[in-house]
Every structure is written in structure tokens, then in C-alpha cells.
Regions:
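Sec-dependent bacterial lipoprotein signal peptides
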Residues: 1-20
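Lipid interaction determinants
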Residues: 20-96, 104-210
């Protein structure tokens, strides 16, 4: 499974590297930015079953809750060095994958990713592999900053997770219980989603803070 993730991560890094990274324009943008919220928007293919359309908010909510619990903090140390931290919201056991990982996309953005207690590093590395290689638009107003994943990478990430029973189960486990939805209902919803997702938008909104 780890080798599979490494292959996918390599593809994601290549995809991410094609997109444009913009340097942070102002010194005042440096420092720690707390994770405020994760936004996920799923678009289905034209002609997708109505039942799936009704299930879109459910799946979007699951991913929002999960990644909001995973993402901890982002720190810009200079105009091209970003440090990010993630933690697994469900496992409390030590992992051999725990540590700090280094990435560089193109010539501009270097990333240090610190993983705490994470038995499925591939999933998080995939997320950040897509996130750090994408366009990020510094917004000085109200001290907000948004990291926007490229749609193609976001779609790949969501399909990879939903298409893997183990990972889909972990994401669902970390999310709040869904009233009235059985395991069979969830499995059917996920199966339909995998076949009918057209596009996915994913972003993390940050706010300056200690």
C-alpha cells in the first residue's frame, strides 16, 4: 500500500509542479497562520442519479470535518519556506511514519511537513503534495490566507480515498455520525460517487495567529 501511495504522490507532485506558485509579496505575511476551515466542493457528472446529488453534501461534510481535524498549523518562515503540521484524528498509537518530510515544488516553494502519529502517511503526503504545488493567493485583508488545491489534484485525492475501503472507513470514522445512514447506505453512496465525480475543489483558509 505504501509503494502505491509513493507512486501516486510522485504523480501528484508532477501535476502540482505544473501550476503556478506565487511568492508571498509582503514581509508581514510571514509567521504562523492557524488553520481555520477546510472547504470541499464536489461537482457530479451531468446525468448523475438524483440520489447521488442528495448525497453530495454528506460526502462534502465528511471531508470537511476530517481534514479540519487533520490540519493543524502553517508557518511561513520566508517568502518560499512553508512549514505545515498534521495529526491523525483517530489513531492514538505510535507510528514509524512519524517525522518531518521535505518537499520542493519548482524553484519557489519549499515545504517542511511534520506528521504526528500518522499510520497512513501516504494520504496526507498526497494531500500536501497537491496543496503545496498549487496556486496560493496571499490576501492581506483581515489577515486571511487561502491555499487552493488544483481541481485535478483535489479530484484525484478524493477518488483515491473514496475508492479505498480502508481509507474511506477512516475518513467516515473521524467524521460525526450521520443520522439514519447505515454502513450499507454509506457504501452505496461512495460507490456511486467514485463513478460520477466530475470535479472537486478544495481549499484551506488560514488566519494569522500564534
Amino acid at each position: 500500500m505504501k509503494s502505491f501511495f509513493r507512486l501516486v504522490l510522485a504523480a501528484v507532485v508532477l501535476l502540482g509542479g505544473v501550476s503556478c506558485t506565487k511568492k508571498l509579496p509582503e514581509q508581514e505575511l510571514y509567521g504562523t497562520w492557524n488553520r481555520q476551515r477546510t472547504e470541499v466542493s464536489i461537482k457530479l457528472k451531468e446525468g448523475a442519479p438524483e440520489a447521488l446529488k442528495a448525497g453530495v453534501p454528506v460526502v462534502e461534510g465528511i471531508f470537511k470535518d476530517y481534514f479540519s481535524n487533520v490540519l493543524k498549523s502553517f508557518t511561513f518562515e520566508s517568502d518560499n519556506v512553508l512549514k505545515a503540521k498534521v495529526v491523525n484524528p483517530i489513531s492514538q498509537t505510535e507510528s514509524t511514519q512519524k517525522g518531518t518530510y521535505f518537499y520542493q515544488i519548482g524553484e519557489q516553494l519549499k515545504v517542511e511537513l511534520t506528521v504526528e502519529d500518522d499510520p497512513v502517511i501516504g494520504m496526507f503526503a498526497l494531500f500536501y503534495g497537491g496543496m503545496i504545488g498549487t496556486q496560493y493567493q496571499p490576501t492581506l485583508k483581515d489577515n486571511d490566507l487561502k491555499l487552493q488545491m488544483t481541481p485535478g489534484v483535489a479530484k484525484l485525492l478524493v477518488l483515491l480515498i473514496l475508492g479505498n475501503k480502508e481509507l474511506a472507513g477512516m475518513v467516515k470514522k473521524a467524521a460525526p455520525a450521520i443520522p439514519g445512514m447505515t454502513e450499507a447506505d454509506f457504501a452505496a453512496l461512495i460507490e456511486g460517487m467514485v463513478s460520477n465525480i466530475e470535479d472537486v475543489e478544495m481549499s484551506v483558509s488560514l488566519q494569522r495567529g500564534a
